Amino acid sequence: MPIAITPEHQDLANSVRSLVARVAPSEVLHEAMETQVTNPPPYWQAAAEQGLQGVHLAESVGGQGFGILELAVVLAEFGYGAVPGPFVPSAVASALISAHDTDAKVLAELASGSAIAAYALDSGLTATRHGPREEALVIRGEVRAVPAAAQASVLVLPVAIDSGEEWVVLRADQLEIEPIASLDPLRPIAHVRANAVEVGDDAVLTNLSMTTAHALMFTLLSAEAVGVARWATDTASAYAKIREQFGRPIGQFQAIKHKCAEMMADTERATAAVWDAARAIDEASPDVEFAAAVAATLAPAAAQRCVQDCIQVHGGIGFTWEHDTNVYYRRALLLAACFGRASEHPQRVVDTATSTGMRAVDIDLDPESEKLRAEIRAEVAALKAMDRGPRKVAIAEGGWVLPYLPRPWGRAAGPVEQIIIAQEFTTGRVKRPQIAIAAWIVPSIVAFGTEEQKQRFLPPTFRGDIFWCQLFSEPGAGSDLAGLTTKATRVDGGWRITGQKIWTTAAQYSQWGALLARTDPNAPKHNGITYFLLDMKSAGIQVKPLRELTGHEMFNTVYIDDVFVPDEYVLGEVNRGWEVSRNTLTAERVTIGSSDSNFLATLPEFVEFVRDGQFDQVAQHRAGHLIAEGHAAKLLNLRSTLLTLAGGPKDRAMPSAAISKLLSMRTGQGYAEFAVSSFGTDAAIGDTDQLPGKWGEYLLASRATTIYGGTSEVQLNIIAERLLGLPRDP
C-alpha cells in the first residue's frame, strides 16, 4: 500500500506515477547512467506543468497550497521511478525555506521550476559578524558531498554562528562548487566551498528551527526511500512469478516466498511511519521529532534491505550493470548517506520517547460524528447508572458487546460508530463483558446459525455466562487445518465424533466449543468438513491441560471418544464447515492483529523500562529500533482502520492488518529479549515479583505469540500468496 490512502491522495499518486512512467522509463535511467546529467532534466517542464515543484508551497508564490503529506506522496512516486536529477533535493530545500517564510521571494521561482535548489544536512561552514552594527555575516568553510549542488541556483546550508547553528540561503554564484563522482550517477553530488561569502541577515532562516529542518529532511527523504523499497518488492515478486527453476516458478519455493513477504512487511511498516511523520509536520505537532525519527530509523534501512533482497531474488542477472537493480541499489545507498549516521535516528527515537513521549496513535473523526457521539455518550451514562447485574444484561441486549454485528445481536454499527462506542465506553469507564475466544466464534453463529442456535447461544455469550473454546488444531494439523482427521459419523439424530484436538485455549474452563470434524473422508481436503457446536460436558470428552514454558496451563489436549452431538448443533451445512471456519479465522486474525496481547509487554511498558535503565550506545540503538518498529505496527492498524472508514475495497486494508499481526508479535518478543539481556546475572532470577523475573516471564511466554493464531511462517505465506500474488504450493 503506498503512502496515499485517501481518494484525493490516490489520484495525486496515480497522476505522478503516470508522469514518471512516461518521462523516466528504464531505458532513460540506463542512458543517464552513462552520460552527463542534463540540467534541468528533460522532465522538469512537464513536472512544473503539473505543479509538482510547488505542490507544498503557498498559492501566494504560485504553489498548489497543499502540505508535506502531499509532497511525500509525490516523492514516493519519484522514488519508485528512481527519477534522475535534482527534483527531490530541490523539493526538500524549498520546504525548508517555506518553513521559515511561506512568502519568501525565491519560492516563486522554485514553484514554477525556473530555479533549482539544493540543501545539506550538515556542514563545516562557520560565520562571523562584521560591519558597524554587525549586520553582515561572512561565511567560510566547506560542505561535502551535497546532492544536486552543481545543478542548483540556490542552496540551503547550515552555518555555525555565535548564536548557534542557523540555516542560510546562498546563491550558487557566491560559492565554489566542485562536482565529484557520485555513488548514484543519477543524482550528482559536489563539494561546496564558501570563501568569505558576505550575506545580510535576510539570508538567514531565523524561523527555521533545527528540529523542524531535520523533521522535514528526514521525512521527505524517507518518502523517496519507501518508494524505492516498494519498487524492489514489486519487482522481486513479479520476477518470482515468471522465473522457473526445477520445473516451477521460484516464487513457489518457500524461501523466496518468505523473502518477498518480508520485503513487503518492511516496506509497509516504513510507509506507515513516513505517512505519520508527514501528518505530524502538517499538524505542527509537538511530537514531530519523534515521528520523523521513527521514519528515519525505518525507511532508509527498508530501501537498502529490499533492494538487496531484490538482487538476491534475481540471482546473477540482478548483479549486472544493465539490470534496474543497479540503479535502485545505488539510489538506496545514496539516500542512506543523506540521512547521516544511521545510529543517530534510533537514538533520537529513544531520547524523545523517554522524555517528551511517543506520538499518540489516534483517529480524528469528522465533526459530523459529534451528534452520534453525544447520543452514544448518553446511552453509556445510562448504563453506568445501573446496578452491575442489570447493566450486564442491558449491555448484552443492547448490542454493545460486538456492535458491528447486525441487529439484534449487535448495533449494525459502521466503522465510525464502532470507534465512537469503544472510545465512549473507555472514557465513561464502563466495562463490557470480555467474551475472549467467543469474539471469533460468534460471527460464525450469526452468519450461519439457525434461529434456534442464535437464541440458544448468543444472549448468554454476550452476558459472559457461556465461555467458549475453539477445537480446530490437531496433532497432525496445526496451521494446516484442512488436514484434520477428527472423524464424525452420522447416526440416528446426530453424529458420533472421535478424535483429538490440541492447543485448545482455556478448554478446561469452557462450557462450549467450536469443533471442526471430517464428515466425508472421500471428499477433497477442504471439503467434507463440518462445523459443530460441542457441549464440553458431554460424555466421552477428556481435557488434559498442557503445561507451558511458563509453568502455566492455558492450552489443552482434548480427547474426544465417541461423543454424540445432535443435529441441532451442526453450524451451517454438513460438509461446508470450511466456509464457516474461514469466517471464524478471519475474525481471529483481525482481533489478534489489532490489539495488544496479554502475553507480551506493551510498547509503553518497554519505553518505561528503557527510561529507567542505563544502557550503552549499542543497546540504545537496539531499543530505538524496537520502539520505532512497535510504534509503526500500531500505525499499520490505524491506516487499516482509516481505509475501512473511507469505505474502499476491503482488500486495500488487508496488507496493514496481516502485516501488523506478524510484526507486533515479533516486536513483543524483541522487547522481552532486550530487557532480559540487559540484566546480566540477575536474568537468572525467576521470582516474577522482581523486575528480572517479570521480564523473564514475558520472554518465556512470548515464544507462543508467533505460533498461535497462525504461525509467523504461515503468515508469511499468506502475505506472499494473497497480497503479492505468488503461486501457492502445489
Where are these regions (language model features)?
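C-terminal helix-coil-helix/basic helical segment that borders enzyme active sites and/or dimer interfaces
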Residues: P25-T35, S237, K241, Q245-R248, ...
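Alpha-helix capping/hinge segments and adjacent helical runs
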Residues: G51, T297-A385, R407, R411, ...
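A structural signal for short hydrophobic beta-strand segments in well-ordered beta-sheet cores
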Residues: A127-E134, T486-A488
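Amphipathic, small/basic residue-rich leader segments at the start of a protein or domain
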Residues: M1-F87, E344-A436, V446, R456, ...
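Glycine-rich beta->alpha junctions and the first turn(s) of the following alpha-helix
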Residues: P2-N14, L52, G79-Y80, L175-E268, ...
